[in-house]
Amino acid sequence: MATRRKDARPDEIRAAALALFAERGFAATRLDDVARRAGIAKGTIYLYFPTKEDLFRALVRQDLLPNLAALEQAAAAHPGPAPARLRDLLATMAARMGAPTAAIPRLILAESGNFPALARFYAEEVVARGLALLASVIAAGVAAGEFRPVDPAAVAPLAVAPLVMTLLGRNAIGRHVPATPGPDDLLATHLDLLLRGLAP
């Protein structure tokens, strides 16, 4: 039992950190707070994560990047034409923005000015890889004549930007603007506009 508990500690610490980062923000959360939330002694957390930045990097690598890898695999295995691949990819991205790990991009957007090294890490590990995935699907569509000739690298950030804005709006002012369409309606409208704009 003790061995299982010890093996589970990194997962428990990351879960506690994610919850606290979402509640308080990165800057306002201390490692001691995370240790208390995880139910471990203050000193124990430093055996696993010497700094708060190390803990954040572990969150990205252990909890976020596997989701991105799954998206890459699903896109590569998708049997449909490029428009269907792009639609399904963006729909899956949008669905995952409701998961607890959606707190991570929110943190980066909110606090990147104070933590440039973490912002750079996130940009290199997550953003660049996600944009490359989108660009590859768009490029395949252009090559197959399923999309009109466009620069995939220019279209990729435009394809995902409305999803990011919806995520931010939902957690900031969205609840104060009751007339705003729901996430599903916004996604459907975005996909319709995007795919019509890419049509040959």
PLM features: residue spans?
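Hydrophobic alpha-helical connector segments
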Residues: 72-103, 153-159
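Hydrophobic/aromatic residues within well-ordered alpha-helical segments
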Residues: 9, 52, 63, 97-104, ...
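Basic, helix-initiating cap at the start of DNA-binding domains
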Residues: 1-40, 47-48, 53-54
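Short, flexible, glycine-rich and Lys/Arg-enriched loop motifs at helix boundaries
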Residues: 61-79, 171-179
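Hydrophobic/aromatic-rich alpha-helical bundle segments in the mid-to-C-terminal region
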Residues: 120, 142-191
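Short amphipathic alpha-helical segment with a characteristic S/N-K-E followed by hydrophobic residues
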Residues: 13, 28, 51-57, 66, ...
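Amphipathic alpha-helical packing segments from all-alpha helical-bundle domains
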Residues: 96, 103, 107, 117-143, ...
